[in-house]
Amino acid sequence: MTILFSMPVHPQPIIDSGHRFDASRHWPASLTLGFAAYPEADTRITRMNVARHYGPLRVQRAFYPEGRDGCCHVYLLHPPGGIASGDSLTIDVTVSENAHALLTTPAANKLYRADSNNVAWTQHTHLKVEDGATLEWLPQETLAFDGSRGEQTVIIDLAETAKCLGWEIIGLGRPASDLPYVSGMIEQRFQLSQKGRPLWLERQAIDPTHPRFLGKWGQGGATVHATLWAVGLSDPADTITELRDKIPANHNWAVTYRRGVLLLRYLGMERNEAWDLLQQAREILRPRLMDVKAVTPRIWLT
């Protein structure tokens, strides 16, 4: 006869890996960059003097395609290639007096579908430009998958004589794959101030279930939204005239100038059309704003 003895089972301690996959999931990443102008011989050279990162958000090295005394080009890298539920990205950039920096990305950013707990993502960007400095904020487009939920914030603080040229482009859904953006919620907030005085404040809730999404009085069903801004122009009226004369007119874009901010908007269905429009506008705006020609970042050509 076989006798079986039961051994006491001692529960093993649960080790928290720091990664959660429930409704409390939160995976942060941050990047802090600083740029300063250093005198050298009879000119100034902009160098990246601060580069701190946490998590999968970083830069490699600066490039000088316009010469050593020209604009400092830096590419923002996010190796995962997209933002998922619980991701929290924070970018802080400061361009000090008389420096000139251009920031862009190597590819489109992706906003993935929310998980089964509907956990949102967040992306916060804070850009600070000091007197005599110039910042070009030129990320490639953001592609929002159906069901994506999150909040995107851009805050720009400019000193009195600072200059800034930037844009944001978002494409909703994947129409080419017959996967439109029919669920989810993306809240975008923009805040641009100069000397602490708000010049442009905007909040846009992208909700495909709201009548505004399809209504002619709202987004009209447009799947691509783009906004370009420019601050520091000395001849805004002539600049707007040139934009309207040189860029082919259609009902998808318009340009305005109020309180020192030039805004060019696109509302349509084609990402390539929006991208081409903003590049054409930059070809006109950069010489007027910075007195240098519009050099294309190398990464856009790869």
Swiss-Prot record:
<dbReference type="InterPro" id="IPR002669">
    <property type="entry name" value="UreD"/>
</dbReference>
<keyword id="KW-0996">Nickel insertion</keyword>
<keyword id="KW-0143">Chaperone</keyword>
<dbReference type="GO" id="GO:0005737">
    <property type="term" value="C:cytoplasm"/>
</dbReference>
<dbReference type="GO" id="GO:0016151">
    <property type="term" value="F:nickel cation binding"/>
</dbReference>
<comment type="subunit">
    <text>UreD, UreF and UreG form a complex that acts as a GTP-hydrolysis-dependent molecular chaperone, activating the urease apoprotein by helping to assemble the nickel containing metallocenter of UreC. The UreE protein probably delivers the nickel.</text>
</comment>
<comment type="similarity">
    <text>Belongs to the UreD family.</text>
</comment>
<dbReference type="Pfam" id="PF01774">
    <property type="entry name" value="UreD"/>
</dbReference>
<keyword id="KW-0963">Cytoplasm</keyword>
<comment type="function">
    <text>Required for maturation of urease via the functional incorporation of the urease nickel metallocenter.</text>
</comment>
<protein>
    <recommendedName>
        <fullName>Urease accessory protein UreD 1</fullName>
    </recommendedName>
</protein>
